[in-house]
Structures are given as structure tokens and as C-alpha cells.
């Protein structure tokens, strides 16, 4: 039997995450979120298959507006996957979403992140921190607002899992440091409704080590 570390429970809508709760099934839509009818149809199909939480991509303002209507037509908690702009998160919160997924690689302005956190805290909406290798900040530039590192500043040349010499800064270190930077912004505002911290890399060994 696996021994699990005790965690603080977080509620996404009415679904309990952590704190000894059962594992829940979450999925993500592959429709264009702006197409409310198609997105709701797919969510209903996932509900029938046993899905308990659903995440939708929010790449622009039209998608953010659609989330409010989608929320009205489904029966499971709705998570907004925010792309690039903090105002999309604010609009989704106003529309009643149950959780946000923020990527610290593409939402890097500290004041903007703080504004999102304040709004989420007012509504008791949890946040998932999702670190993606494809949009990590530049090496030495965590918290800065310029540049995407897959094309600059040595991120691609960082040693991967199992390749780093002792004491050498690796892609694992960079992914963890990126998450810790955003966690610090949440914690400085006494925001403790962190649903999960997730990491995505191209290789399984690096994902496992992170």
C-alpha cells in the first residue's frame, strides 16, 4: 500500500481534491471553446462516461465569454485553462468558473498574477499551477516578462533527467523553480487554494524526476 503525504483539501465546485479524498476523473475538451454548443455536447458525453471535472482552453476573449454560458449548461465543475493574458482569467472568474489553470511560463507579470489571485481569493476559486516545458521562462529570467525560452537563453541545452552532473542546473531545476516562483506569489497573498502543481515535459524520465 502506498503511503501518501497528508494534504490540505481543496474544493473545485463541490468536488474535493486532496485531504484523503478519492481520486477524481478529469478531462479536457478538444472542441473550440467559442463553439458553446459543440463544447457542451462533448462535456455531456464525458459526464456520461464518468468525468467529474472538465477543463476548457481559453485562448482569447471570445472563449472567456463562452465559458459563462458553458457553465450554465453543464453539471460538473468547470476549469479555465488560461492562455497568455491575465484578463482572460478575470473574465472567467466573473463568469463563474470553478477553477483556474495558470501557466507561469506565459503569464509572467507579477502584478497581473497578483490581480488574478486576489480575484480568485474573493470568490474562493482554487488555482492549478501548470508548468509546461514548451513555454518556460528564459534561464535566469524567471519572473521576467519578455522572451519565450524554447527559442532562446539555453533552456533546450539544459541537461535532462539523469544527465546533470552534481550541482549542475538542469531542466528539472528550472521547471521546479518556475513553479516555486508562482507559488510564492500566491502565498504572499495568503492564498492556499492550490489545487495541484503539474509539470509537462517531452520525456517521461524528466516528468518523473520533476
Task: Please report, for each region that a protein language model flagged, where it lies by residue.
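Conserved small/polar residues in nucleotide/adenosyl-binding loops
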Residues: 200-206
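Alpha/beta enzyme core
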Residues: 12, 17-23, 33-56, 61, ...
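Short, glycine/acidic-enriched loop or turn micro-motifs at the edges of active sites
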Residues: 25, 84, 206
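N-terminal basic/disordered segments at the start of proteins
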Residues: 2-15
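Active-site flanking residues adjacent to catalytic metal/cofactor-binding acidic residues
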Residues: 80
